[in-house]
Amino acid sequence: MLCCMRRTKQVEKNDEDQKIEQDGVKPEDKAHKAATKIQASFRGHITRKKLKGEKKGDAPAAEAEAKEKDDAPVADGVEKKEGDGSATTDAAPATSPKAEEPSKAGDAPSEEKKGEGDAAPSEEKAGSAETESAAKATTDNSPSSKAEDGPAKEEPKQADVPAAVTDAAATTPAAEDAATKAAQPPTETAESSQAEEEKDAVDEAKPKESARQDEGKEDPEADQEHA
């Protein structure tokens, strides 16, 4: 079968080649020539209309038609762009919820992490607060113990004072006088020293006064002698 198909195809090709050789023109060339003829005739028709319009004053109408033809593709392009823009805007809101979902999913772990982080510092703060309270309790207990020791020490002192008072009461008046004298010597010595200084000053002043008196007596005697 394959051999038959190949043979038939070769025969058909040979027939086509023979026809092309006889005509001298390929079908592609024929189509191209026909298209060029149509375009040339169309252009000639347009040029003729333009010439007639110029003669009759229909040129503005032709220009308006040409502008309308030019504006129509532009309007179509704008509409296409607007359609594409709306499609993109619709796609953007459609995709935004999807983007929000991962963001929410990302926020959830972050919130969990924050919760864990807050719980850990809170536990640490609680532990530190307990240690501080224990330290304060120990410090509070230490002053109380000191206060307890203070009255305990004061009690023996107070107990010693009445004993000393009783001993002092038991002593004789002579001992009291001796104690008062022993306490007073500094003042007495100061008074005695002041008295001695005053006496010395008086003794020094007396010779000076006597010398002055003697001089006063000698002066009248000398005056009498001179007289």
Curated annotation (Swiss-Prot):
Membrane topology: Peripheral membrane protein
Keyword Membrane annotated: yes
GO function terms (MF aspect): calmodulin binding; lysophosphatidic acid binding; phosphatidylinositol phosphate binding; phosphatidylserine binding
Biased composition (Basic and acidic residues): 9-32, 54-84, 98-127, 146-158, 202-215
Gene Ontology cellular component list: axon; cell periphery; cytoplasm; dendrite; filopodium membrane; GABA-ergic synapse; growth cone membrane; perikaryon
Annotated organism of origin: Mus musculus
Induction: Up-regulated after memory training in radial arm maze experiments. Up-regulated after sciatic nerve injury.
Gene name per UniProt: Gap43
Main location: membrane
Annotated localization: Cell membrane; Cell projection, Growth cone membrane; Synapse; Cell projection, Filopodium membrane
Residue numbers bearing the Phosphothreonine modification: 138, 172
Name the record gives this protein: Neuromodulin
Effect listed in the UniProt record for changing residue 4 to S: Loss of palmitoylation
One GO term (biological process): regulation of growth
